[in-house]
Amino acid sequence: MTRPNNSTLKNVAFYAACFTFSVALFVALAVAGHVYPFGDNSFLTNDLKYQYIDFFAWFRRVLLCEANLRYSFSQGLGMNTWGLYSYYLASPFNLLCVLFPADKLTLFVFTTTALKLGCIHISSAWFLQKRFGLPMPAAFLLSLSFTFCSWTISNLRNPLWIDCLILLPICAYGCHELIRKRRMIRLVIATALNVMFCWYTAYISILFLCIFVLVEFVDYAAEEGFSWKLMLDRALRFAGAIALGLLLSAWTFLPTILAMSKGGPVLALGPLLKTSLKSLIRGFLPCMWVNNESTPQFYCGIIMMLLAVSLLVNRKVSIKTRIATLVVTIILVASSVLSPLEYIWCGMRVPNGFYSRTAFLLSFFALWAAGYALQKLKERPAFRRAHRPAIIMPLLALTAIELFANAHVMWNQLYVGYSEEANSTYVATATDTITAIQDQTSASFYRIDRTTTRVDSAALNEGLALGYNQLSSYSSANNPQAIALLNSLGYSSVGEFSTRYAEPILAVDALLGVKYAIPENAPAGYVLAKTNQTDSESAVYENPYALSIGIAASSDIQNSTLKSENPFEKQNDLYSKILGREVELYTKIEATSTENSDSLQQWSVTVPASSIGYLYINKDATAGSYWPVTLTIDQRTIENEAWRFDNNIRQIADASDAPSQHTVSIGVAEGYTDMPQDNEPVFYALNLDVFKQIMNELKASEFVPTVFKDGRIEGEYTAKDDGNLLLSVPYDEGWNITVNGTAVELTPAADKGLSSLNVQKGANRIVMTYKTPGALAGLAVSLATTVALVAAELYARHKKSRR
């Protein structure tokens, strides 16, 4: 038996110390900030509370075989969830969620964050030792600075991005090995893992490595001499390594690309400059970061930054290397300043929030430059004593205090205003409400939605977490055509990638199978459900008109494009195409303007008898997503309307036997000094007699499935004639369908937000199963690449052994 030598034990102890120190510092931050589990300030902040916590709950259900990894009906109208998995959840750390109860997932997030920080410290310390041969104390100090740089601390709210910081040092050392030793395998494997864990940060990392490898090549060529043959050889090896990494990860990368490439809203490129000179300078200073979307997170420890700068004036370093270092530094700083560069780094898309997403690259490059500078300083006799404990320990203590102070200032801005107790209470109440509905309903298909969320108006993924089918969705990985359809029908702002069910819309709810609503106010057309909920915020209402998953429809709906004047006319057009004749569910109400000023506009509206009155605000083209108004309907006030999450059809009044008079006004929203002057409210009435007649007609030809679960629909449908069956399932190429054992094609409907299939007169046995597009092809590519790499390695070893 081989016993570990002292060097091995020393290394293990060193990396254990790195891990433990980072975890301890992280825990100390939580204690100082009274952050859960050491206080009531929840660790859930920003997108952690809006998105991730529900995604983790869903992933936990997937791992426990309670949900399907490939497809879910719990977001929008349904979606391919491979993009959701690969973008948000592919980190191996997330497998630990099964070890935590459903009501302790905040603790799971906190625990995995601590583990990731410890691993970043280990990875970056390993890189410094391997690349520059730094002694342990110096490697410990610099890697600690990288681990707790401003970018990391501010982006713990985006767990999917953090794994990249573990792999980036390994990728960088792979570049060094490739240039110096012509070895590719480390870079190949690290690139593959990077893509597997999060393709988004992998793209950013690969783009950076294309620049970083040039610096390593310049440094190597400065020592060994330049030749075009050498450059071509290394360029081909680098390109080959990246390509092989992508091929190895094709099992997840290919289906991800297919899932995420369906289009969707694209933000316009903003102003050329993303920040001001003052904010840019603040970004380099400790304790000066401001959570205002304009302060870049460049700070990464004063000692490390000074060492990095010293490399530029160190004459022991080749002038070519120093120039290359300066050029890359300028590019990385400019990437957080200039919109076009940010656009390139973020996948040729304008990022929505979380400014300076690439600042971690500058922090890593500072780590590399500081390590290089220390390597050169170590060669000077005068600096050899600097690595002694008497000198390095005070520097380490000062660095730790400085990093802690900076992180504490940032946490005081990020981890406030949301109580973990309030979060736990809401989840428990919501779970009880949904369970009560599910226990009393035997139907295989129905949808549920609610107008209140866990926090603010953006926690819209509760269906995924609790296992029910909802319309609301807030995710960068969804079915964009379904979201676009929902928003255009009046559920949210047109052009947004999210949908919020802010208020029931009877006619669309019925068509899409929303049988239960949990609203703040009693919705017109609904009846109180028998769920015995005493809490008014959890009162459940039942939609007696809700249709099943499929209905007979005319051929007009196939490959149809709906009119887009406003949501009411769009609904009229949708129902007309379904029925094959012109119908007017909604009629326009003429409103009389009673006041029109820059700060207040008011109308008097008369709702006809036997009709539900609604309004919708067509937004001013200049209003964008973040310029709301205050909407008042009689005595009811909605503080923020016509903005990102609240641009919805709103109920004016329930139906009555006689016409009713109402006052509607829009004014300046709280926190704003003015309002968009060209916001245009439109007023319509839903004719209940026409609506009920249409519902009776559609209910006579419903397809009621016997099996309805994520990724699978089965059932018998009896058609009166050969015709078309409309499904409230978004069109997706991944559906495989048989009717009476014969394969049939799904056809797009309603701007691809719905789908349809042809059926024959009489009995139709329908079976729909979902297979992730690209999954089998990607797996085949990954397996073939793995076999080829193993064969190449075995051949190389065999060839070497014969020499």
Which residues does each predicted region cover?
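Membrane-interface helix-loop junctions at the exits of transmembrane helices
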Residues: 27-36, 62-66, 96-103, 137-158, ...
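Active-site-proximal, structured, solvent-exposed surfaces of multi-pass membrane proteins
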Residues: 2-8, 55, 582-803
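Membrane-helix boundary/interfacial segments in multi-pass membrane proteins
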Residues: 42-45, 152-162, 271-296, 330-384, ...
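Start-transfer (signal-anchor) and selected internal transmembrane alpha helices
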Residues: 1-35, 233-237, 395, 787-803
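Signature aromatic-anchored transmembrane alpha helix within multi-pass, membrane-resident enzymes
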Residues: 243, 377-406
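Extracytoplasmic/lumenal acceptor-recognition loop(s) of multi-pass membrane glycoenzymes
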Residues: 401-421, 438-509, 547, 552-578, ...
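Membrane-embedded helix bundles of polyisoprenyl
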Residues: 22, 113-131, 136-220, 234-257, ...
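Membrane-interface coil-to-helix junctions
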Residues: 25-121, 144-166, 204, 260-265, ...
